[in-house]
Swiss-Prot record:
Originating species: Drosophila melanogaster (Fruit fly)
Alphabetized UniProt keyword annotations: Cytoplasm, Guanine-nucleotide releasing factor, Transport
Gene Ontology CC terms, in alphabetical order: cytosol; intracellular membrane-bounded organelle; Mon1-Ccz1 complex
Lineage, highest ranks first: Eukaryota, Metazoa, Ecdysozoa, Arthropoda, Hexapoda
Keyword Cytoplasm: yes
Known role: Part of the Mon1-Ccz1 guanyl-nucleotide exchange factor complex specific for Rab7 that promotes the exchange of GDP to GTP, converting Rab7 from an inactive GDP-bound form into an active GTP-bound form. Required for recruitment of Rab7 to endosomal and autophagosomal membranes to mediate endolysosomal and autolysosomal vesicle maturation. Required for fusion of multivesicular bodies and lysosomes but not their formation or trafficking. Involved in the replacement of Rab5 (and possibly Rab4) with Rab7, also known as Rab conversion or the Rab cascade, during endosomal maturation.
Protein known as: Vacuolar fusion protein CCZ1 homolog
Reported consequences of knocking out the gene: Accumulation of autophagosomes and reduced number of autolysosomes in fat cells caused by disruption of Rab7 recruitment to autophagosomes leading to a defect in autophagosome-autolysosome fusion. Impaired lysosomal degradation of endocytosed Notch and Boss receptors in the developing eye leading to their accumulation in the brain.
GO biological process: autophagy; endosome to lysosome transport via multivesicular body sorting pathway; vesicle-mediated transport
A Pfam family reported for this protein in Swiss-Prot or TrEMBL: Intu_longin_2
Cell location: Cytoplasm, Cytosol
């Protein structure tokens, strides 16, 4: 039997963005490359990679009426393609995981290309674009006021470099990506009716302060009120808040942190706005300028995509995101002061009451839990609301005893997407899958909800699996909040 010497997981090889309509003149092929990571690669290599991608896209276009080439698998790499806007292509290149074994005294590499799920990593590629659009707008709109096409391209390249240099450093390790990353899903915090209504009342801020067009509330990393944002925009807001606000102290990045944010995180006593940071020329230190314009984001409200100012307010464990029309004058300090005086007492009281309620629930649940709940063989479940992209699961995503990659890939293949075609497919179905490593996956779909139960039992029969899955469905599907949308 061959001895396993080493296993190399999935890694990011390169990520680049190009547009074939640029650089049409011979000798200007480099203009097609708008962004390339890693940046220290020779220009000729970048041009060759983009040229190869162009050839692949054109070749596959001869076999389908769609202009969307999706993936190319080779022995050592997997390339994922995504065209978010006409002419603009994002390409993600991954190194295939491999196992190095010793056979008859010779090291042999066994590449495991089947472990890479196209659906998971194409979803991550789409999210890379959606986060850019959320913070900067569409590719085609960047520099639209500039009449010179070369200068317009340069402005776009600068924005891409500024955004993706930071975004890729915060990107989740490809080896750890799973079905949750594919779904772009978020978790809502279920509350009792009284607390939920108190949180919902902050939606009336639009009446008290007409400048506010929408508000989103989170408690730690879970959403309390999602407002009228689309699931995709809500996921972008959630990702931005989690990465750039909630985890800012643990991060070594240069994200702006106001004194009020540091105070609200560390002491959890006084609320405050998270303000932007302005770099002062010739000064090594960055300063928070209280007159800085708030961050501008691009979301869809009332079926219209347009820019909004995003104000982020922190009080204890609550984060409140306020959206103001960016077509108007940027908010002045007086508005910040009025909002702070109005919201601080109410949000602080609400945050403390939620914390108290969660503490009581945790104490009650502690007596019912057992240590086997997180074991590798314990039943796992995942429930998905396709329309709101809510999910509920007991997956331990960051622990070593998580689900094997082949199981996650099967779930990704079984999962229905949120697109119109997928949502109009079979309204109800049930599928059971047995894997080679003794896992059973049971999927049920009904009324735009997907339910998965994952069992690990080598001796289980089909009847045993059916009965256990039914028991878990009946036991866990008791939260009406999850199914109300």
């Amino acid at each position: 039997m061959a001895k396993l010497l080493q296993r190399v997981e999935i890694t990011l090889r390169s990520f680049y963005i190009f547009n074939s309509t640029f650089g049409q003149v011979e000798g200007e092929e480099h203009k097609k490359v708008l962004f390339y990571h890693p940046n220290d690669i020779e220009l000729n290599t970048k041009i060759k990679d983009v040229g190869l991608s162009e050839a692949i896209i054109r070749f596959t276009g001869t076999f389908t009426s769609e202009d969307d080439c999706q993936a190319l698998h080779t022995q050592k790499t997997t390339q994922l393609f995504y065209q978010p806007e006409p002419g603009y292509w994002l390409v993600l290149v991954l190194n295939v995981p491999k196992e190095v074994r010793l056979k008859e005294g010779v090291e042999v590499a066994d590449y495991r290309g089947a472990e890479i799920s196209d659906r998971i990593y194409r979803a991550i590629l789409r999210q890379c674009y959606q986060m850019f659009r959320f913070q900067n707008g569409c590719f085609s709109s960047c520099g639209s006021e500039e009449p010179n096409p070369d200068k317009r391209r340069e402005l776009l390249c600068q924005k891409l470099l500024q955004f993706y240099d930071q975004h890729l450093t915060n990107l989740r390790d490809p080896a750890q990506c799973d079905i949750i990353d594919m779904l772009h899903s978020i978790q809502y915090l279920p509350l009792d009716k009284t607390l939920f209504l108190r949180a919902q009342n902050f939606g009336t801020l639009c009446e008290t302060f007409p400048d506010i067009k929408e508000s989103i509330m989170l408690y730690q990393e879970q959403v309390l009120c999602g407002g009228k944002l689309s699931p995709e925009d809500l996921h972008c807001v959630h990702s931005y808040v989690v990465q750039h606000v909630l985890k800012v102290e643990a991060s070594s990045s240069t994200i702006a942190v106001s004194p009020s944010l540091k105070r609200s995180i560390s002491e959890c006593q006084v609320g405050g706005f998270v303000r932007s940071r302005q770099k002062v020329a010739g000064d090594e230190h960055d300063a928070v300028n209280e007159e800085d314009h708030p961050m501008k984001v691009y979301v869809t409200l009332d079926k219209e995509a347009k820019p909004y100012y995003l104000l982020i307010y922190r009080a204890l464990h609550i984060t409140l995101c306020l959206f103001l029309n960016a077509d108007q004058v940027a908010p002045k300090q007086d508005l910040y002061d009025d909002l702070h005086a109005y919201m601080a007492p109410q949000l602080t009281s609400l945050a403390r009451d939620i914390s108290s309620e969660l503490t009581k629930e945790a104490v009650g649940a502690a007596g019912q839990d057992n240590s086997s709940g997180n074991s590798e063989t314990a039943p796992k479940y995942l429930f998905i609301n396709e329309q709101s992209l809510q999910h509920h699961t007991n997956f331990q995503r960051h622990l070593p005893q998580g689900l094997p990659r082949n199981v996650l890939s099967i779930i990704a293949d079984l999962a229905n997407g949120s697109g119109k075609a997928e949502m109009e497919s079979a309204p109800a179905e049930e599928v059971q899958v047995k894997t080679t490593n003794d896992y059973w996956i049971v999927k049920r779909r009904c009324n735009y909800r997907q339910y998965y139960v994952i069992l690990c039992n080598s001796k289980a029969t089909l009847l045993d699996v059916t009965q256990e899955a039914r028991r878990i469905f009946e036991q866990e599907l008791t939260d009406d909040v999850f199914f109300d949308k």
